[in-house]
């Protein structure tokens, strides 16, 4: 079910009403109702929420991620505006999963994302459980057509390649995608040995998944990771980034479905996000698995908002054309 955007969630401190250098995001955000016609836009990105944690429930995780789109948007509203002149940021509303209808909601999310991309708008999808990524994929594939080579980069502690014999969950979507679409490549950054069974590592090898373990992603090895990202992107026509917040150490991101005692530092994750999003082939981003109900002092929500803003600041398509 589609819910149009509401101005009421975009409020915050006002340091000036005339000096744009003092503006915050809530003073620059625009509302974009997807239930009406869309006109082509340039230098534009849009947040769209996926109010859903049905996949988390089916995966026996801690529910609460459906509260994240509203919480993350509220945190984003308070952040200062540093985007280039000419950039426009929109709130495109939310797709709400009602009565457990996960598959229908993922299809609706896909249609919304396809419309944004076809109008020249870069989607920044705020989940929701990581089942969000399947709807994200559906929209990108619809916009690109069936023959484009699509690379998916997943910053995550888990492969999310579980079998889906009993239906999709928040842990099955990349297996679904790879089974359905032979034009997709899959690369995972931050995989944890203790977060995946040996069977899942074997499945990752069988599906041709590229990955870098969390313990290999250190500040001293970041250039090697960048090179792997460049090589992966070079083999695809377009790239999408999906961020699962459980890839981050629980000390910095406790409010997730499956917190980890290990994990990436926020600064290292930020470096990866900047590198991936600034690549000219990257067309969209999603961020998932924030659970405000179990967060500590709002730190996970705040970090998620910061990651979303980093994506906006480094999107190539939001920069002025030269």
Curated annotation (Swiss-Prot):
Cofactor note: Binds 2 manganese ions per subunit.
Function: Catalyzes the conversion of N-formimidoyl-L-glutamate to L-glutamate and formamide.
Entry EC number(s): 3.5.3.8
Superkingdom of origin organism: Bacteria
Record-level Gene Ontology MF annotations: agmatinase activity; formimidoylglutamase activity; manganese ion binding
Higher taxonomy: Bacteria, Bacillati, Bacillota, Bacilli, Bacillales
Name of the protein: Formimidoylglutamase
The protein's enzyme class: hydrolase
Residues annotated to bind Mn(2+) 1: 130, 156, 160, 244
Entry-linked PROSITE patterns: ARGINASE_2
Pathway given in the UniProt record: Amino-acid degradation; L-histidine degradation into L-glutamate; L-glutamate from N-formimidoyl-L-glutamate (hydrolase route): step 1/1
CDD domains: Formimidoylglutamase
Organism from which the protein derives: Geobacillus thermodenitrificans (strain NG80-2)
Gene3D superfamilies: Ureohydrolase domain
Keyword field: Histidine metabolism, Hydrolase, Manganese, Metal-binding
Binding site for Mn(2+) 2: 156, 158, 244, 246
Cofactor: Mn(2+)
Gene expressing this chain: hutG
GO biological process annotation, one example: putrescine biosynthetic process from arginine, via agmatine
